[in-house]
Regions:
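Long, low-complexity, charged/polar intrinsically disordered regions in eukaryotic proteins
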Residues: 1-31
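Positively charged, polyanion-binding regions of nucleic-acid-associated proteins
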Residues: 21-44, 55, 67, 73
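Short acidic, hydrophobic short linear motifs in intrinsically disordered regions
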Residues: 43-63
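Short amphipathic alpha-helical interaction segments
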Residues: 60-77
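A short, conserved structural fragment
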Residues: 74-87
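Short, cationic-aromatic polyanion-contact patches
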Residues: 86-100
Length: 100
């Protein structure tokens, strides 16, 4: 098994501030789909992003996985959800709902 370099593990460095959503999609729309995938226990960012992307596709929302991941990072940075690890590395970081 070859060891991955950090660059090879990075899935996306897109920042939410750099995202331009299509007119048919709002940040609130994405938040609903992302929160539907979250739980109190830690989940890999890759899982949350992948399932939110499936939900977007099922609703014909033209949103990429990079955009969803950027929104997840923005939610963590805003303190809306919790995250651990380098969130640009989807398989090596996790998110969850804030424990109350």
């Amino acid at each position: 098994m070859s060891e991955e370099s950090e660059e090879e593990r990075i899935c996306s460095t897109l920042r939410w501030d750099d995202v331009r959503l299509p007119q048919s999609v709002s940040a609130a729309d994405l938040d609903v789909l992302i929160f539907h995938e979250l739980a109190q226990n830690w989940l890999k960012v890759a899982r949350v992003v992948g399932r939110a992307k499936e939900a977007c596709d099922a609703r014909s929302l033209p949103v990429s996985m990079d955009v969803i991941a950027a929104r997840v990072r923005a939610l963590v940075e805003a303190g809306t959800i919790e995250g651990v690890g380098n969130l640009t590395m989807w398989r090596h970081s996790e998110v969850r709902l804030i424990a109350r």
